[in-house]
Amino acid sequence: MKKTQGFSLIELLVVVAIIGVLAAVGIVGYQQYIDNTKGDVAKTNAQSFERWIQSTQIARSGGLTVQPSACEKKAGSLTDCFTTVLTAAGAPFEKFKNPYTSSGANIFAYDNSTTAFTEGQPCTGRTWNSGSTDNGSNITSAISDAFNTYGLIVIQNLDNASADLNRTDNSLKVGYCDGDGNFKIVADNISF
C-alpha cells in the first residue's frame, strides 16, 4: 500500500503568504484604476459640456431655437441659462452623474466673479452664481468641503458682470475640479 503525503504546514503558510501579497498588490492597483477612471469621466463630462456650449452658441448666433429655452438669445443674464434647467427632465445634461459621489452630487457650477480660475487652483471657497446637483437642487453658495467639488464642471464667464444672453460673444472658460479638488481647464475663452 502506498503512503499518501499532503502539504506540510510550512508549505501551506508559504502559499497563503504569496496569495496575501498578490491580493494586496491587486487591491492597490485596482483602487488606482478606479481613481483614474473617475478622473477620466470628470474630464469627459466637462468636454461634453464644452461641446454643448459651442454647438448652442452656433445655433444662437444663427438665430435658431435652442433647448432649453432659458439659453436662447434674448434679454437676460447667463445665470438664467446655467441653472437647474440644464439638468431638468429632458434637458441636455439630465443623465449627467458626478463620478466621485452618489445622489445629490454637484454636477456643474457657473461663476461670473472678477477672479478667474487658474489651472491647479483649489475649487473650494468660491461663491457660485448658479449651478445644479444631480437631484435638481440649485447651487448658489460657496462649497467649502473639497470632496464636494470633486468632479464638478465649472463654467466661468470671463466677461464678468456684462454677461448677457442677448449677446453671442460672451467669453467662457470651462473646466472641472479633479479628485484632489483642484481646477483643470478644458477650454479657455470660448464664445456663448
List each model region and its residues:
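Periplasmic/extracellular, small/polar-rich flexible segments of pilin-like filament-forming proteins
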Residues: 58-192
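Compositionally biased, intrinsically disordered low-complexity segments
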Residues: 13, 17, 37, 177, ...
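N-terminal single-pass transmembrane signal-anchor helix
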Residues: 2-34, 45
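Membrane-proximal N-terminal amphipathic helix
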Residues: 35-64
